[in-house]
A protein has these predicted regions:
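Active-site helix-to-loop segments that bind/position phosphate- or nucleotide-bearing substrates
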Residues: 1-203
Length: 203
């Protein structure tokens, strides 16, 4: 980014308890519209988010006819989980990579999260969660349902196509501005940075 405006806004918002909670509520509302979360605490938000995500996993499992038990994996051992957990790990890794690139290109700090804290990619996880249930989870289940013999490679291809179809970078840029910038503007400088990351024409 050619300006520090978003980073300054992010820093101001995350260091104030009231504004941090306000952004966290806005993130929840973007993921699950139609719910009134205006009075929920951070702990209540996390609890409700967890319940909604578990329900989403069960729904996608039914859609693809795949048995779903629970999220069970070892971050340092990709092949330790079953096929579905490996697929979910690969899909979320792809999503995190793209979101991280956008966050950095916009000049934001990957570490200053609102819901997630204490990690050098906390804000990346916050933003990625906006799209995980929509993009990453279905891609993972779809690959497993196809009886793939190369989970990692097939999930990467599925995520490439899903992120392209969803215009993820464009949406991510807009959503970060919406969350951090009270003016809700997308400067030309920011958009140039994003276009340079990924040519949507496939080049």
């Amino acid at each position: 980014a050619r300006t520090s405006r978003l980073l300054e806004a992010q820093s101001a918002l995350v260091t104030n308890q009231s504004s941090r909670l306000r952004v966290a509520r806005a993130m929840y509302a973007m993921r699950f519209p139609g719910e009134d979360v205006s009075v929920l605490t951070m702990q209540q938000l996390r609890g409700r988010e967890g319940a909604r995500v578990r329900a989403a996993y069960r729904e996608v499992a039914r859609d693809y006819g795949v048995e779903w038990k629970s999220r069970n994996y070892k971050p340092d051992d990709f092949e330790a989980g079953d096929d579905l957990n490996m697929a979910l790990s690969a899909a979320t890794a792809c999503l995190y990579g793209v979101v991280h690139a956008v966050v950095v290109a916009l000049g934001c700090s990957p570490a200053l999260g609102f819901v997630h804290t204490g990690h050098d990619r906390s804000f990346v996880y916050d933003v990625a969660d906006l799209y995980k249930v929509e993009i990453a989870v279905p891609a993972a289940f779809r690959v497993v349902a196809s009886e793939s013999v190369d989970i990692g490679a097939d999930v990467r291809r599925a995520m490439r196509d899903a992120m392209y179809d969803a215009h993820l970078m464009e949406r991510c840029t807009r959503d970060v501005h919406r969350l951090l910038d009270s003016r809700g503007e997308s400067d030309t400088d920011y958009l140039v940075d994003i276009v340079e990351l990924w040519d949507w024409r496939g080049n």
